[in-house]
């Protein structure tokens, strides 16, 4: 579960460092991935934050591209697909809040599929 004590690289408590991995993911998570090499909890949250952040950006980008393409062909399809963007944002914010709360509690809460990838990369 959670490792106690202070982190070696940043000097932050592990739960605070884990929360910061999600604050501006994937950017902050990459920083903690490089700085906190010894703490497996922080490494897990850093990897999960990176994969979640990049994945969210990729999905939103893909929806926008598909919306533009279909909008050029059939305007109503572009508009319908364009409605997915706010729904994806809302879902991502809910998942982000859950990740932040669980990280603060010192829990390794795994996102489906992404959590297993993060655990593998973190060496857990």
Where does each model-flagged region fall?
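Hydrophobic alpha-helical transmembrane segments in multi-pass membrane proteins
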Residues: 17-35, 48-99
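Membrane-interface extramembranous regions at the lipid-water interface
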Residues: 1-55, 101-124
């Amino acid at each position: 579960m959670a490792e106690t004590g202070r982190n070696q690289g940043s000097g932050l408590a592990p739960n605070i460092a884990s929360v910061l991995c999600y604050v501006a993911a994937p950017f902050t998570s990459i920083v903690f991935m490089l700085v906190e090499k010894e703490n497996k909890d922080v490494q897990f949250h850093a990897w999960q934050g990176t994969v979640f952040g990049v994945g969210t950006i990729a999905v939103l980008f893909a929806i926008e591209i598909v919306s533009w393409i279909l909008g050029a062909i059939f305007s109503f399809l572009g508009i319908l697909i364009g409605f997915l963007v706010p729904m994806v944002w809302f879902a991502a914010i809910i998942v982000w809040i859950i990740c932040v709360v669980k990280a603060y509690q010192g829990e390794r809460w795994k996102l489906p599929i992404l959590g297993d990838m993060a655990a593998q990369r973190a060496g857990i």
